[in-house]
């Protein structure tokens, strides 16, 4: 059976996995960031990440006001088959924690790119933000790297309800 791929306009879909075009990705850790109009960035787990983890049962998130370094955990997720950190993709300060995912981590399995974001971070400076974003996959590069990752792990994305 051939691989399933579609261009949905604002996102690509490959093997059932959504890859929104406007996001920056850490492919290895399967975490994304979106740059917001107010200068903050929103961070969450990718569709591939939530599929690999399985139904998420627990989340521990660093509190608002915590200063984070790129690569250091902003949260820890746990499912029945996996537990691991969610790294910050930019240096800055946590300015908001999503109460929906704290109350029900499984929400990430349902809507990983929408209302199920994990934290919002105010970057330390424009310079550090530019530096940090330049080290992430974006656009066509993200699309190709994500497809390679999906193929290597033989993933077909599903959203757990």
From Swiss-Prot:
The keyword Transport does not apply. One of its GO terms (biological process) is glycine decarboxylation via glycine cleavage system. CDD domains: GCS_H. InterPro entries: 2-oxoA_DH_lipoyl-BS (IPR003016), Biotin_lipoyl (IPR000089), GCV_H (IPR002930), GCV_H/Fam206 (IPR033753), Single_hybrid_motif (IPR011053). The modification N6-lipoyllysine is found at residue 81. Binds 1 lipoyl cofactor covalently. One of its GO terms (cellular component) is cytosol. Residues 40-122 form the Lipoyl-binding domain. Keywords: Lipoyl. It comes from the Bacteria. Its cofactor is (R)-lipoate. The glycine cleavage system catalyzes the degradation of glycine. The H protein shuttles the methylamine group of glycine from the P protein to the T protein. The glycine cleavage system is composed of four proteins: P, T, L and H. PANTHER family: GLYCINE CLEAVAGE SYSTEM H PROTEIN, GLYCINE CLEAVAGE SYSTEM H PROTEIN-RELATED. Belongs to the GcvH family. This is Glycine cleavage system H protein 3. The lineage of its organism: Bacteria, Pseudomonadati, Aquificota, Aquificia, Aquificales.
């Amino acid at each position: 059976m051939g691989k399933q791929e579609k261009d949905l306009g604002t996102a690509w879909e490959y093997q059932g996995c959504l890859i929104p075009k406007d996001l920056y990705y850490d492919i290895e850790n399967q975490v994304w960031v979106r740059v917001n109009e107010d200068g903050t960035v929103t961070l969450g787990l990718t569709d591939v990440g939530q599929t690999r983890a399985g139904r998420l049962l627990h989340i521990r998130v660093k509190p608002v006001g915590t200063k984070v370094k790129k690569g250091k955990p902003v949260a820890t997720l746990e499912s029945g088959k996996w537990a691991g950190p969610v790294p910050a993709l930019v240096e800055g300060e946590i300015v908001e924690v999503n109460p929906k995912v704290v109350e029900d981590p499984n929400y990430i399995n349902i809507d990983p790119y929408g209302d199920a974001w994990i934290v919002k971070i105010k970057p330390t400076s424009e310079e550090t933000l530019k530096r940090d974003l330049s080290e992430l996959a974006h656009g066509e590069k993200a699309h190709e790297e994500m497809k390679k990752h999906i193929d290597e792990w033989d993933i077909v994305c599903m959203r757990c309800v």
